[in-house]
Structure formats: C-alpha cells, structure tokens
A protein has these predicted regions:
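Axial heme c-ligation environment in periplasmic c-type cytochrome domains
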Residues: 146-149, 180-209, 345, 408-418
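Extracytoplasmic soluble-region selector
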Residues: 29-131, 140-147, 151-152, 159-162, ...
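Bacterial N-terminal signal peptides
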Residues: 11-26
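Acyl-group handling in specialized metabolite and lipid biosynthesis
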Residues: 168-171
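Short, structured secondary-structure elements
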Residues: 138, 151, 155, 160-166, ...
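Flanking scaffold residues of small Cys/His-coordinated metal-binding clusters
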Residues: 129-134, 480
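N-terminal secretory signal peptides that target proteins for export/translocation
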Residues: 1-11
Length: 524
C-alpha cells in the first residue's frame, strides 16, 4: 500500500513530467520549426492603437487566414479573427496564435498614453477620411463635391478640408455642445440617411477618434509634429498560388526615425483585381488565372507597392520554363520574367516573319519581292544582324522615326510658324541619320539655345511657352510619367504631388525668349 507521502511525491513527479513534455512540444512549435509571427512583440502606445499580425509557416508561406487568434485578457487588448490587434487600456498580456497543431504566444505591452498625445486633424482625421473613401474622386473628393459637401481629392489640401468640415455652411457639420450629435458622425455612422452608406460603425476605433477630435475642440497638427517620411507594405513582393490568401502590413516611418503600423488606416487598390484583389484589412486574395498584379497601399499622401506574381501551374505548362539563348540584356530580362511566371518562350520566328517585322519596325514599310528573295536565300548565320544594320543606315529609317517623334513633340505652327516646324523635322531626321545618343538628344531639347529658324531643338521650348506645358511634355517623353494630374491635386495613383509638379516646373521658369512668336510665319 502506497503511503500519503509517497503518493504526493509520485503526483508531483507526474506533474513535472507532463509539464516537461508540454514545454518541449511547445518549444518545438515556437522554435525554428514553428510559426513566425510579425511583429514578434507588440508594443502599443496607449488605448486605441492597432497592429496587424502576419503569420508564416515553416516554408515561409502566409497562413494568417488559417490561424485562430485569442487574447488572454480581452479587457486589455482585443484581436479580430484576421489578426488585427486593438489596445483597450495600459497593461501587459499575450495573444495566442493557433495554426493546426502549432501554438505560439505573442507578448503585448501597452504603455500609458502620452499626456501630450491627442487626436489632430492632419495626423488622424485625414487618414480616416481617405481610408474610408470620403475624399475619393467618386465621393466628396470630386470636382464639385457631393450633395453640397466638397473635400480635396485624397486630402491634399488640409486647410480647405478643415474649413469645409468645421466652418462651411455655418458650421453645421460639427456640434461641439454634443459631439456625438455632429452631422459628420451621424452621416458617417448611418444614423441619418447618407448616400455613401455606413462608413464608421459606432463601436469602431475610427468613430471613437473622430468623436474625441470633436470633443477636444477640433485641434490641428503643429508644425513641429512628426511627419510621415515614407510607408512600406510588407511583403513588397510575393508569389502566390491560385485562390490563396496573403496578409499584408503597412508601416509608416516618421521624421524622428520611429515607425508605426498603419494597416488599419491605409487605403488599398489592386491594378488587376481579377488576378489579385485586396480587402480593406489588407488581405490579398489571388484569383484562378496566372499573371502579375500590383497592390498599392496609400497613407498620408505616401505610396508603397507589393508586386504579386501568380506563375502558370506546372500541370498546364507542358514544356518546363527555359531561358532564352541570347546575350542581349533585354532578352535576359525577359528570360528572368518567363522563369518567374513559369512560362516557356515561344520558338524563334521564321525567317519570312522576322523579315516582315524588322522592315515594319525600322523603316515603316514591307520589303519588296526582290529584297525578300535576296535575304531569304542568304545562308550566313549573322544575316539577321546584318539586315538590321543595313536598315538602320537607310534614309527611310530616319524619315520614319523622325515622323514618329514629330507626332510626340507636336509643334504648333500657329505658335512657332511653319518654317520652324520644318526646321524641327529636319533636325529630327539628322539626329537619326547621325545616330545621336539618346541622352544627347534629350539634352539638346531641354537645354536648347538658339533661333527656331536655325536650331530645331529650340522649337520645342518655343512652342510650349509656359513652364507647366513643358513639365507635362518633358515628363511624359523622357521620364515616362504623367505629372499633369499633380498640377491641381495629389496624383491619385502615384507618389507625386503638387510640390513635385511645381518644383519640376521651376526648372523651366527662367527660360528667356525673344520675338513675338504669335503670328505665323514671322516668329523666329
């Protein structure tokens, strides 16, 4: 018969053994063979702060959508089923992340809110208005607003928006005596009819921030407040299988070197939603088709892009991807892209197909029957290269491509006169005949100096008389970007704003011109 003392010792031994087994299996899950959590430790500054969790398995695959999240203290911090963490009060706790048989705990530390920290218009309200589409081009950000309420497109004009919300229409949108009855909140939360629908649920963090801003007297940001330097979407590049999910995170980096998770305030957009769509919480959902898509995240006039690649399934690709047998750098780039997308390059074009294409591309016409028979009969291994060089030395090449560039530059004879237009066209043909390097070609146009009767490059500067016109043309032709959208407001799909447009235009602001340049053909 076992005595009480021996029984107690035996029970303690069993408990110790069970604890050792549990911790060893747990350390196996938490170690190198377990889950990877981003961020590994969550630190929040006061209540109302939010962070998005990403979970990766041992293969580096995103499994956030397949995880179960649980807060050990829901009074301190709560977590959604998509891994979005929201602080309720200062304290410490842990969040449990479960994926199949793997379990991991994430430490959460919530500090007391800074005494000087407060909700301000530029720092907090504008991101909310942008995140929920209030200042989008399809809503109040359109040219004349919506239903009597206009905001600047994507919040590019803080002064205009602040006045529209707090003072316009006799200040009817804000009710400081009873902040929760403010029209701004009642419309956005759906308490009164709103054409845009319910945007801010009353139990949501965004609603609470707008309410606090109204209660505190609608403060604005000060000049010494931290500024957003840039944002980063994580991951910046991802390869996905069809019909899978990947969670993104958006980090904002500030002027003092600190960073903050702003996934919940970022606005997302996909370039090809059929291939890869993204929801408001930053979860990417791939479609059934292979291809590439760019996911854009926008926050406080800053942009970041995640490139999504969906390679062709091997079961659909009979031939394995092979590299192009070429030393040309363009072919090498194409080869890398083919391998990345799981594509096999097409076979080389037949000689007669190549002949037709190279004639049309270089001199803009088909080969004659005699030219075709002569070249097809050649047996030299480098006959394609020799043909291209011969075509590049022909006068038709210069005429054909000068005409293309004249279409791009589009000189107006009513601005510069017919003679100047002919001078420009002659200069373009000479550039192609002499094989002028492209950088020198661009330099001669941008830094043109001379008469439009003698210097063809100066016709472009003379024709586009205003700095903003030159900015539009030069940015399109030589930078490959469209800056004209940023002339009136921040570019809706690029990183460029009004400052970028007018800083660029300032380069052309001091160009001097002589002569009237009004009546054709006397300008010169």
């Amino acid at each position: 018969m076992i005595g009480p003392a021996l029984r107690q010792a035996y029970m303690l031994y069993l408990l110790a053994l069970l604890f050792a087994i549990y911790t060893s299996s747990a350390s196996f899950a938490w170690g190198a063979d377990g889950l990877t959590i981003e961020p590994p430790v969550i630190e929040l500054n006061g209540p109302g702060e939010q962070v998005q969790i990403r979970v990766l398995n041992t293969k580096g695959e995103d499994v956030t959508a397949a995880c179960v999240f649980k807060s050990h203290d829901a009074n301190t911090v709560r977590v959604s089923n998509k891994g979005q963490v929201t602080s309720n009060k200062a304290g410490q706790t842990k969040i449990e992340v479960v994926n199949q048989s793997l379990v991991q705990l994430v430490a959460v530390k919530i500090a007391e809110a800074d005494a000087g920290s407060k909700v301000t218009f530029e720092k907090d309200l504008q991101p909310i208005l942008t995140r929920y589409g209030c200042n989008a081009g399809s809503c109040h950000g359109k040219q004349r607003g919506q239903n009597g309420f206009q905001l600047s497109l994507l919040g590019f004009d803080n002064d205009f928006d602040f006045y529209a919300i707090t003072s316009e229409s006799r200040g009817r949108r804000i009710f400081p005596a009873s902040p929760k009855d403010s029209l701004l909140l009642k419309k956005a939360s759906g308490q009164v009819p709103h054409g845009g629908g319910k945007k801010l649920p009353e139990d949501g963090n965004a609603y609470a921030q707008v309410l606090e801003w109204i209660k505190n007297g609608q403060p604005r940001s000060t000049h010494d407040e931290l500024k957003v330097v840039n944002i980063e979407i994580i991951p910046s590049e991802v390869k996905m299988l069809p019909r899978t999910k990947v969670q993104t995170r958006v980090l904002a980096r500030y002027s003092d070197g600190t960073s903050k998770d702003v996934t919940h305030l970022a606005a997302f957009q996909s370039s090809e939603s059929v291939l890869a769509s993204i929801d408001a919480e930053g979860m990417i959902q791939s479609g059934p088709l292979p291809g590439e898509a760019a996911i854009m995240a926008r926050f406080m006039e800053k942009f970041s892009v995640c490139l999504v690649t969906l390679p062709l399934p091997e079961t659909l690709n009979v031939n394995l991807p092979t590299r192009i047998d070429s030393q040309h750098y363009i072919d090498r780039l194409l080869s890398d892209k083919f391998v990345k997308l799981g594509l096999s390059p097409s076979d080389l074009a037949a000689d007669h197909t190549y002949l037709r294409r190279v004639y049309l591309d270089l001199i803009g016409r088909l080969p004659t029957p005699e030219e075709s028979r002569s070249w097809l009969a050649e047996t030299a291994p480098d006959k394609k290269e020799k043909l291209a060089l011969r075509l590049l030395s022909r006068p038709e090449y210069a005429d054909f491509w000068a005409n293309k560039w004249a279409d791009l530059l589009r000189p107006n004879p009513f601005h510069v006169g017919m003679k100047a237009v002919f001078v420009l066209h002659t200069w373009l043909r000479d550039c192609f005949r002499k094989n002028l390097p492209y950088d020198q070609f661009a330099k001669q146009i941008i830094a043109a100096d001379g008469s439009t009767f003698r210097d063809g490059a100066s016709v472009v500067i003379r024709d586009k008389r205003q700095p903003d016109e030159l900015t539009t043309v030069i940015s399109r032709l030589f930078l490959g970007i469209r800056l004209e959208c940023a002339k009136c407001h921040h570019h809706p799909f690029e990183v460029y704003g009004q400052d970028d447009f007018y800083h660029f235009a300032a380069f052309f602001g001091r160009i001097g011109k002589k002569g009237t340049g009004i009546s054709a053909p006397i300008s010169g």
